[in-house]
């Protein structure tokens, strides 16, 4: 409780342990996490009913239910690898861009962050979840940090600062966007009720909003799934 989340080591070796090995465990850091979970090529997911919008899902390790939430709302989804460039995405002329969840430290993805920074200048509607929330924040000039204790589980309460309502959300992250570093034009819109950390941002200099939690959570909670409806309305208004 005093030291926060720490690395662990499962071993059959009996003590005393080698000091060098213990130091390696202590300093272990997962690298290139997104590369291990992103798709290798573009996959097209058709809308469930008559197509109304074409969406690019920038896939950093997306949960399948993100795609389901979009296709059931008449969206054709182009599921793209994390290494796709801003130029390639804009050439597809999507109605909106979805930044998915994914693993690891957001700051370990400088190339992706740079491509997101480029694409923000196009002014396309954007919706980010979890890692996508963090990556867009960094691209816009904010900073992230490792939490002493990450948020894990399907019972995390978040408060909508616009309405005052509290929702129960599903979360699985160990990094946070540091609210004191938010750039001009970025408004914190959700906070975690337990520890007060940033859980959502709306950008007033572009049509974009992001959340740290998972509104697409399957099998729930479903409290915030209507954020996908907000994204749809944003594209209609664009």
What are the language-model segments listed below?
Residues 78-80, 145, 189:
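General small-molecule cofactor/ligand-binding pocket signal
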Residues 164-206:
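Catalytic beta-strand/loop cores that center a nucleophilic Ser/Cys/Thr
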Residues 102, 206, 216:
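Flexible loop residues that form catalytic
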Residues 54-59, 169-170, 209-213:
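Active-site-proximal beta-strand elements of phosphoester/diester hydrolases
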Residues 96, 100-176, 220-235:
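Cysteine-nucleophile active-site neighborhood
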Residues 77, 126, 208:
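Hydrophobic anchor at the start of a short beta-strand
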Residues 1-93, 106-108, 218-220, 226, ...:
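RNA-binding accessory domains that recognize and position tRNA/RNA substrates
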């Amino acid at each position: 409780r005093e030291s926060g989340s720490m690395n662990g080591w499962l071993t059959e070796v009996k003590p005393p342990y080698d000091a060098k090995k213990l130091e390696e465990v202590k300093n272990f850091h997962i690298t290139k996490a997104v590369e291990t979970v992103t798709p290798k090529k573009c996959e097209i997911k058709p809308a469930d009913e008559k197509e109304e919008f074409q969406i690019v899902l920038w896939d950093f390790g997306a949960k399948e239910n993100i795609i389901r939430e979009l296709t059931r709302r008449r969206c054709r989804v182009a599921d793209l690898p994390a290494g796709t460039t801003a130029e390639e995405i804009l050439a597809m002329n999507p109605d909106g861009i979805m930044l998915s969840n994914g693993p690891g430290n957001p700051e370990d993805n400088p190339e992706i962050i740079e491509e997101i920074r480029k694409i923000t200048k196009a002014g396309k509607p954007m919706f980010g979840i979890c890692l996508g929330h963090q990556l867009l924040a960094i691209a816009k000039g904010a900073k992230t940090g490792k939490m002493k204790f990450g948020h894990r589980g399907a019972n995390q309460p978040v408060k909508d600062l616009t309405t005052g309502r509290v929702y129960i959300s599903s979360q699985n992250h160990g990094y946070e966007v540091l609210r004191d570093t938010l750039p001009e034009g970025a408004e914190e819109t959700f906070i975690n009720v337990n520890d007060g950390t940033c859980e959502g941002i709306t950008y007033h200099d572009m049509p974009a909003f992001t959340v740290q939690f998972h509104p697409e959570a399957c099998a729930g909670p479903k409290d915030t799934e209507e954020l996908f409806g907000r994204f749809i309305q944003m594209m209609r208004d664009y």
